[in-house]
A protein has these predicted regions:
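A structural motif corresponding to the C-terminal lobe/cap of the Radical SAM core domain
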Residues: 1-127
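Short, amphipathic C-terminal "tail helix"
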Residues: 123-145
């Protein structure tokens, strides 16, 4: 189902960005690896990976506090790219490693640059077709009058 939706959107020139939270109780190392593979397989254009972050006054914060799984109360660590709780199915160090793995694997090599180049070409082509494209003239004076 997701594959078909992604394909339909991409066929209409719409880029797909996935926002992925890593570290949920259902995830382990293998789950995260399969998730990254799936995103690449279905042709997601961009992905943003974050680590589950139990911010104050959130339900997940209350749950993790109740379970004694909060590892840090230093708010400078609450950046969505650092593990500040004890994951259920892996060590905090393994989750941190999987976070880096997700970014590096999704954006490895030149594939990302090629995808962004293709996306940019589609945008320009569409703007040219509908008359909204304006070429930037470097010789034209710009400024306030």
């Amino acid at each position: 189902m997701i594959r078909n939706r992604v394909k339909r959107l991409r066929d209409h020139g719409i880029a797909i960005e996935g926002s992925i939270i890593l570290g949920t109780d259902e995830q382990d190392e293998d789950t995260i690896k399969r998730l990254v593979d799936f995103l690449l397989e279905i042709g997601v254009d961009m992905a943003e990976f974050t680590i589950l972050t139990p911010f104050p006054h959130s339900p997940i914060r209350a749950q993790l506090e109740k379970e004694g799984r909060i590892l840090s109360n230093h708010w400078i660590d609450y950046t969505a790219d650092k593990v500040v709780f004890q994951p259920k199915r892996m060590t905090p160090e393994k989750l941190q490693e999987m976070y880096y793995y997700a970014w590096e694997t999704f954006y490895q090599g030149g594939g990302y640059q090629l995808r962004m180049g293709e996306l940019f070409k589609k945008v320009i082509r569409r703007e040219m077709d509908d008359g909204t494209y304006r070429r930037y003239d470097t010789r034209r004076k710009r400024g306030f009058q």
